């Protein structure tokens, strides 16, 4: 019988390493692949060098270096993202290029929490990473067990400061390097055969147990951003787009949300894909949705079709933003309060006015900043929604809605 027939049945979870430079994120990422590969032939090992030279990818007009690895435990299949540079982390988390269901915070026991440790925890809070598990690395370099307790306490305090449950978060102590060196010596090392390898398994157990399996997109309330609208003579108005979440079928009541002064309700009279009728459209499908009693003028690109009551239009919000550097194709100069770029949400640009927080005079290219935006038209918004900031069609920043104001 073929090995690896079970792959599809395991729940899938997205994770990633975060933490200060040189605390061992990439070494740990490599160790996770080696350790799980010893027990599972489906896992491909990735060594430090493979992960460190991460390929460039583009998300919302921004170039980001990101390494993706995959591994599995008996319970789950994981996609894991690791970024080589600090700026890459900021860009990655703000654009949501690699969404994380949970993060592994790596802290060197020899150094304790450092500036980027704090910055990454803050970012995780702002962009809505729901769970953090801590790996206290390099414990072989610290002789005094009391020092380890102290570092653990500092990390827990820091997590509490940013509204993570610091007292409940699992903290695993180990050495990614010693585990990786053991796996290099004997790639078949199993759980129970080496204390450092066992620490990696302890981390995997914590990830399995502590980070819940996310609700699949298809089980969330229906939402489809409208990309295009046309009329089918004799049948009515069709809105096309890719279903972002949930499902839709004939007879469902939906709301048309955003851009218009009023949200209006209508009923789905048909769902089509490549000109063929569908029983039901689900998350990820590109479909045309036929709407009852809606004229061609009453629905437009940039609106969303959604399950009634699941999302509302707003004009004012707070956002966490990364401003592109000049070398990344961004602005050459800073900007002030009153700056009026376009904000690109899902399928459309809407002009908005930026209000910087008290004490911040100016924002420079390369900055990571939080500010308030007031849009000239209402858009279907929710916390965690990503957007691009554009000027004359080019991307100058990326952001995520952290709080809806009105």
Swiss-Prot record:
Enzymatic reactions: GTP + H2O = GDP + phosphate + H(+)
InterPro entries: EF-Tu_GTP-bd, EF-Tu_GTPase, EFTu-like_2, EFTU_2, G_TR_CS, P-loop_NTPase, Small_GTP-bd, T_Tr_GTP-bd_dom
Region listing for G3, in residue ranges: 82-85
GO molecular function, one term: GTPase activity
Binding residues for GTP: 19-26, 82-86, 137-140
Phosphothreonine PTM sites in chain numbering: 395
Gene Ontology CC entries for this record: cytosol
Domain tr-type G: 10-215
Highest taxon listed in the record's lineage: Bacteria
Protein name, UniProt field: Elongation factor Tu-B
Organism: Thermus thermophilus (strain ATCC 27634 / DSM 579 / HB8)
Recorded name of the encoding gene: tufB
């Amino acid at each position: 019988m073929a090995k690896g027939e079970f792959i599809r049945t395991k729940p899938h979870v997205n994770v990633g390493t975060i933490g200060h430079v040189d605390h061992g994120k990439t070494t740990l990422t490599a160790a996770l692949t080696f350790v799980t590969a010893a027990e599972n032939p489906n896992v491909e090992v990735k060594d430090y060098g493979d992960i460190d030279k991460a390929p460039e990818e583009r998300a919302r007009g921004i170039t980001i270096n990101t390494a993706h690895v995959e591994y599995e435990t008996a319970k789950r299949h994981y996609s894991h993202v690791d970024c080589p540079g600090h700026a890459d982390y900021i860009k990655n988390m703000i654009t949501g290029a690699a969404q994380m269901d949970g993060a592994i915070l790596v802290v060197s026991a020899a150094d304790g929490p450092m500036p980027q440790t704090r910055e990454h925890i803050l970012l995780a809070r702002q962009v809505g990473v729901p769970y953090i598990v801590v790996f206290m690395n390099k414990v072989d370099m610290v002789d005094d067990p009391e020092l380890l307790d102290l570092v653990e306490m500092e990390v827990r305090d820091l997590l509490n400061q940013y509204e993570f449950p610091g007292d409940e978060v699992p903290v695993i102590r180990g050495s990614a390097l010693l585990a990786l060196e053991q796996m290099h010596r004997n790639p078949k090392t199993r759980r129970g055969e080496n204390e450092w390898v066992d620490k990696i398994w302890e981390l995997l157990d914590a990830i399995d147990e502590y980070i819940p399996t996310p609700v699949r997109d298809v089980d969330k309330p229906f939402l489809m951003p409208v990309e295009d609208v046309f009329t089918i003579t004799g049948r009515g108005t069709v809105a096309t787009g890719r279903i972002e979440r949930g499902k839709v079928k004939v007879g469902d009541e939906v709301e048309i949300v955003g851009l218009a002064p009023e949200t209006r309700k209508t009923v789905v009279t048909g769902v089509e894909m490549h000109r063929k009728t569908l029983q039901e459209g689900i998350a990820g499908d590109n479909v045309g949705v036929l709407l009852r009693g809606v004229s061609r003028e009453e629905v437009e690109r940039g609106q969303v079709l959604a399950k009634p009551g699941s999302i509302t239009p707003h004009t004012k919000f707070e956002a966490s933003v990364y401003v592109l550097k000049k070398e990344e194709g961004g602005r050459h100069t800073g900007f002030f309060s009153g700056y009026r770029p376009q904000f690109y949400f899902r399928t459309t640009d809407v002009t908005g006015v930026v209000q910087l927080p008290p004490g911040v005079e100016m924002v420079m290219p390369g900055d990571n900043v939080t500010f308030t935006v007031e849009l000239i038209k209402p858009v279907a918004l929710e916390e965690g929604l990503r957007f691009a900031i554009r000027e004359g069609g080019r991307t100058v920043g990326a952001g995520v809605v952290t709080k809806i104001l009105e």
